[in-house]
Each structure stands twice: as structure tokens, then as C-alpha cells.
Amino acid sequence: VKKSIITSIILIVLLASGYYFWNKPTAKNETQTKDNPISDSTKNHENEVDTAFLKSVFELDDSYDYNSDSLLTQGEDNTAGVSQDAFAGQSRINIALIGLDGRMGATTGHADANHILSIMPDIGKIQIISIPRDTYVDCGYDDTTHLNKLTVYYMAAGRQSYLKKLAEIAKLQSIPYYIEFGFSQAMGVMSLFGYKSSETLQVLRSRKSFAIGDYQRVYNQAQFVKQLMVRHYNTLTGTFQPVFINGILALVRTNMKYSEISNIFSKLEQNKFTASPENISIKIRPSLKANYKVFDFSNPEMIAQMKQQLGLDRIAKRDTTAFTPTNFTKYLEKKLTKIIITAAKDTLKNPQLAINKLKPTYEQKIWLQFDNDSLRNLYSKKMSDLLQRAYLRRKDTLSANRVKAAYIAEQDLFIKSKVR
């Protein structure tokens, strides 16, 4: 009888365990507690997202694991993940590159891409330091919420605290400069340099297809930046330097000025920065020693081939949570037109309300998601003109002039540039 009782107890425990694991609450339900009201929207995307490629931003759990022979690689990098830094002690100018993942019209977002341009002008070197978005950072939440990570810290603690934390992880003294951009700005810059923006971002955001996941992803992003700089550096420093620098500054949020960037370029050239592509190196923090795959991102055709090999369209089609308009161009036109019409009504009686309605969408440069140049220029002008009028109604000529200057710089960038 005793043996039978023990056997029954064991059986009950096994059945209870099985029921728990088969019916385990989702992470979404676990995080929605009274003490932890902030949900991880980096995983639970809402219906209206700031992206022209929509499904490409969703990364479904997929068991695909590609070896080095299944993709076209240029080799491997076995130094990016080592803890030692060959340039330790060098004088540096550190600039954070922050890619924000936010909804259309949102005033903030999670830090989805976290990179640092660590420039050493005295020796003609640039080190791109890349940090995975899910790197552990204490944000003040219980660890069971899965919210204690770098991507959440930006929103939870603010930009200045984020920059200090970024410097700590990267083992740098400080990061005085930042350049922030969202999906729209990223798409605009990529289109400017001849890339099919949605396709390129889809590849650069992919992590499920690699054995080391997010570490390979941030390395890919850093490698893309490196190859872009190598390929177009002469354009950025040649006759059209003012057009490119001022234009890009108009697209992003930054505390840098034209003169500062121009001086950095000049010092790098004086110290033979352009002599070799190897003057740009990549460092991964926290360190993870691995053989990072080096892919060719310099050619849009290669990116298209890589997208196909990774099966990203197949993965995107499996997503059932994304809101996907049948015609994205018409959808975006409708959204922007509605914002413009409602803000225009407020301009005369309540210009501050009009500014509040326009500013978030304006700062995200949502119109850059249009593939059509005419539509992009049309809505850029409509948004800029209306925002200028609202500022002038408040007698804020300084802000109005800034909006006007940014519009002119953007037009010069896309119309006068020879890269497109």
C-alpha cells in the first residue's frame, strides 16, 4: 500500500509539471503586473509601427541556423569579440549612434541599435563599438519581467544616463556626442546611398538565422557602417561635403555641429585615414570571442541575395500579429494628411496645439518612408510649412527658421546629391 501511495504521488507530480510547462503563461502576461506597468514593446509590436517594411521588423523564433558555407561571406573576424583593445589609451572622440524603435508619432522609443563611433583622429583610426540591445542593465525591474536590458534603459533612464551606461559597457571614459535616428531616417539615408531601404533593414535586423544571434546582428550592422564609409568617404569629404553633412544633420537628432564633423574629417585625412579600409575596426561589447561572419553589404544585389538565402520573406509571412496595409503608400498618405488637416485647423486659434500634433511626426521624418520622390518632397514641404507657420504664430522665429533651414538642407541632400 505504501509503495502504491508513493507511486501515486510521483504520478501526480509528473502530471502537474507537464500541465505547467504545456500551459505556461506567456512573457506578455508575466510582465503586465501592477508593479511593472511597462511592457516590453520591443517584442510585442503594436498595430501601427513606424516602418515602411512592416513585417520585416518582426523576428519570429525560427530554428534555421546557417553555417559559413550557406551564405556568401568575405571571411571571418576573430578579433572583434576579444576583450583586449589594441587602441587602449588613445585619445578619442566618441559618438553614440542610437537607432530608436518607436511607433509613428511617438516622442520616444527603445534603443534598438546601439553603436559608438570611437574616432582617433591623431592616428587616423575609427573603431566601431557595437553592443547587443538585450545586454543586461539594471533598469529597476524584477528580473522575471525580462525588462532589465539596454534597449529598455534608454526609455526608462533617459538619454544622459543611457550614454553613461553605454560608455561603461564599452569601457570608454565618456560619450559626449550622440546621433539618434528612427526607421524613417534610416530608410532615407539608405535610399540616398542607393540601397533598397526596406530590404537592407530587413537583413540588418535579422538575428534568428545566426548561431550567435544578436552578437552577429550588431556585428553585421557595424560592418555595414564600415563598408558604407569606405565606399562613400570621398563623397562625404569632397565638393558636396556641406550638402551631405548639413543634409544628414537635418534628418537626425544630434548635438553635433557641421564644424565639429568637418574638423574630424580633416584630421582623419591628415593622418592617412583613407590609406586602408583596415583603419576602421569593429569591437563587440560585452566581449564574446567568436568567429564573426563578414558579409558583403557594399552591393545592393548581394543584400537581395542574402535576404533570399536567409529566408526572411518566409519568416515575415509567418507573422500574424503585424498590421499590414494592402497599399502602404496610400496608408501613409492618409495618416499624414489627417495629421496635417487637424493641425492646420489649430494653427490660427491654438498654434501650440498644432505644434504638439506636428512635432513628433516631423522629428521622425515619416515622409522618408515613401519610395516615390515626389510624394516624399510633397509631404516634407507640407509638414515643414505648416510647422513654420505655427511657430510664427507664437512669435518663435528661431524655431521657425530652424525648420526652414532643415527643409532646405534636406532638399539639397536628396535633389543635388550625385549618389542617388
State each model region's role.
Residues 1-4:
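Positively charged n-region of N-terminal signal peptides that target proteins for export
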Residues 6-20:
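Hydrophobic membrane-insertion alpha-helices, especially the h-region
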Residues 16-420:
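Non-catalytic, solvent-exposed segments at the cell envelope interface
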